[in-house]
Amino acid sequence: MSHTPAPASPEAGPEPARSTSEGHLTVGDVVALVEAAAPPGLAASWDSNGLICGDPAEPVRSILLAVDPVTAVVEEAIDAGVDMVITHHPLYLRGTDHVAATDPKGRTVHRLIRAGIALLNAHTSLDAAHGGVADALAERVGL
């Protein structure tokens, strides 16, 4: 897991990133940057990618990166005071009809929302993206 400050003015994608009055990117800006690098159209039909919870208008000052959106990651995000968590694997792989706090995934969503933390995941879209996970692994093993 990695805790990194969000860039103030990234140079990615065809449109310049917007920012809040304090100069921070917004949740929506970060989503757009991730989707520019890993377009949702590249995702497998069975996969779930995108913004799981969070207000696109909220500022993002810091981001926690992780592989899975598990309880330990949520606790680390809350303790670190980050505004957003980006994971590779999705919280919900299939559609859901509830987010009650009576099950682990529902509790995760509730904890994130109460803490004001957005959750974004990019799974197979990032795997398939040019320069993404598959390309990086292929390069590493010499393919």
Q: Which sequence ranges carry the predicted segments?
A:
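Hydrophobic structural segments
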Residues: 1-143
